[in-house]
Amino acid sequence: TLLIAERCEVEFDTKANYMPVFPTPEGEDETSWLIKEVASGLAYRYPDGVPDHVRKQADYELDVIISMGFPGYFLVVADFINWAKENGIRVGPGRGSGAGSMVAYALRITDLDPLKHGLIFERFLNPDRVSMPDFDVDFDDRRRSEVIDYVTRKYGDERVTMIVTYGTIKTKQALKDSARVMDQPFSMGESLTKALPPAVMAKDIPLKDIEDPAAPRYGEAAPFRELIATDPVAKEVFETAKGLEGLKRQWGVHAAGVIMSSVPVIDVIPIMRRLQDGQVITQ
C-alpha cells in the first residue's frame, strides 16, 4: 500500500463544473426553459396579473442567473421540490438567503414573496461575488428517502451519491478503548473518564492538554494528573490513549447531504456501495 500511495498523483480541478444537466423539452435549452418556467410561475403566483415591479425583479434575477451560468441549478432544484409537493411530501416554505429570490418564488422553490417581505436577492446571488447559489431545502424526514430515490432514477445512480462522514475518537472514547484493548477491567476506563474535568460546550479537554501547563484548562485536570501519577497502569492507559485520540473510529452517512453530478461520480471522487442496500456513498 505504501508503494501504491507513493505512486499516486492527484490534482483537483477546482474550476470544473459538474452540475447535473436538467433534461429539457425538445427545442429548449436550460436557459430558454428557465425563462418559460419563470413566466409560467409568475402567472401562477399572481393570477390577477403580474405587477410591473415583480416582473422587473424577475427579469433582473434571470439576467444574473443566466450570466453566471446557473439556469440548470434552478431547474434541478425546482424539479425535485415540486415533485415532492405533488407527491404529498411536506416541504419547508424557504429558509436562508434563497428566500430572497423572486425566480425561486416563481418556480415554487420557496413560498415566500421576497418583495412583500423586503428580502434581498443579492444576499443569495451576487455577480460581484462569484459563488455557488445555495438553497436551504427542508423535507419531511420520514419521506426524504423518496426524494433521493426520485433524483437517483432521473439522473442515474452513477451520478447521485450520499456523503460519507467519519467519527473521530474523542477523549473519553480513547481512554475506554485503550483500557479495553489492554485487558484492563471496565472500572479502569470509568475511573479515568470520571477524573476528567467537566465537559465545556459538550467538549472534553484534549488529552494532550492535561499535561501542558500552557493549556487553558490545565488547572482543572489536577485530579486526573494525580490519578495517573499514583497508578502506573492508569498512566500506561493514558499514554496509549493519547495516540488514539483524533483517529477515525467509524464511518457513517451524512444525515442530509446528497451529491448530484453531470458525470459519473466515480470519475471525480472515490465511492463505495453500502452492503445493506447498495446505496452509493463517497469515500
Q: Where would I find each of the regions flagged by the language model?
A:
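Alpha-helical scaffold/interaction cores of sigma-54-like transcription cofactors
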Residues: 2-283
